Amino acid sequence: MTVFWAGRAWLDGRVADDVRVRCDEAGRVAAVEAGVGPEDGDRRLPGVVYPGGVNAHSHAFHRLLRGRTHDGGGSFWTWRELMYREAARLTPESYQRIATAVYAEMVAAGWTSVAEFHYVHHQPDGTRYAEPHAMELALARAARAAGIRLTLLDTCYLSSGFGAPLTERQARFGDGSAEAWLERLAALRTRVAQEYPPGEVSVGAALHSVRAVPVQALDVAAAGIAAFGAAMPLHVHLSEQPAENEACLAETGFTPTELLAEHGLLGPRLSAVHATHLTRTDIELLGAASATIVMCPSTEADLGDGIGPAHALRAAGATIALGSDQHVLLDPLVEARMLEQGERLASGRRGRFSPAELVAAMTIGGAASTGLEVGEIRVGAFCDLIAIDPDSLRTAGSEDAQLVMSATSADVLEVVVGGVTRVANGVHAVLGPLSGVARTLASVAR
């Protein structure tokens, strides 16, 4: 059993003094006390301790494009062509190497859990690997090496657009039918449960988008997902681009949100990623369903997607979570800050999300999205902690409760996942100095 002591820590939406956190052998919080001094043998954490960030949307291999796509202008759709090129060259071995480095960067930045929206399932020509879960297991092994908690969202991807088959470059994403995808998903769940303990790696479901899952397949997918039980997370890219909305309306007469509602896919298990271009009816439907909305501010800014109606969605009853998506940066604090900054730009008003609400989006919102017992320093939750420096050049003078408005990942001093220190003083417990991780990232991007 490990006991941590922090001079200041985030408990129940505020900063408390002199906090002692006892973790059991399963890596969960067994006891929390505030207003107590350290005891002999306690591990003293530096700075101000917050719950670890929960990254609710990741495409690990997109990290290969960071800083390499900005000299030609374009849009989301031209960027996508570059992304397909990277997807085409992935193998299980290279994907594991890439994801290990990316997940290590996440942990060092303060993300302690990640939902990986994964659709590169098969060989480039669409045939299965001899090990049918080779790509998925590569991600699971990468998460274990990096020390991050993984929700592996196995994605259904069947068409390139409404009424259009997958292109040659998309062949490795598809299973041929919703039934075949569900069969493979069920087998993957069984395999992961056999090899990984609960909370380390878990399996969820994703529909890539309404344009990538034919209307006739939505009912099959909905029934199959429901059969897995209420705890199975379901994620979908939703209304990221106006062109998707226009095509959906032309093909079905519904917006993407309305189409999901028509097929029984709205509900508390659903995480709608981006949700950038919504009608008032869409917002009301998502709020009434108690859905989670995963905003990815750095990616949405990088790709010129737009600013989603996060404030209106929260007011309607939705939960807000955060994701790093294509990893233009990996920084939960900056991601949270950009959520508020986007709202300020769109509304002309400050304080649309308070610092406490931004911390909640970075932590509790992601817990709702992944179904994991994380995001809070409380009894029963996993003991995932990040220690933030309140005295750096960026944070000096900031109030402890407002560090989310000034700190960056460079101010993360120590990261604990499951009661074990994974990163401290620029060194990863398994992978060594973070400079080595950086060299790996540089080499795989070439």
Task: Enumerate the predicted regions with their spans.
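Alpha-helical scaffold segments that flank or form the walls of functional sites
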Residues: 67-149, 180-198, 439-446
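C-terminal cap of metal-dependent C-N hydrolases
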Residues: 382-438
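Histidine/acidic-residue-rich catalytic or RNA/ligand-binding cores of hydrolases
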Residues: 67-68, 242-254, 282-287, 304-313, ...
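His/Asp/Glu-enriched, well-ordered alpha-helical/loop segment
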Residues: 262-269, 311-391, 406
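Metal-coordinating catalytic core of metallo-dependent amide/deamination hydrolases
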Residues: 125-273
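Glycine-enriched alpha-helix->loop->beta-strand junction motifs that scaffold or abut catalytic
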Residues: 225-231, 265-268, 285-294, 315-320, ...
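Histidine-centered catalytic micro-motifs
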Residues: 51-63, 233-240
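N-terminal metal-binding scaffold of metallo-dependent hydrolase/deaminase domains
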Residues: 1-38, 48-49
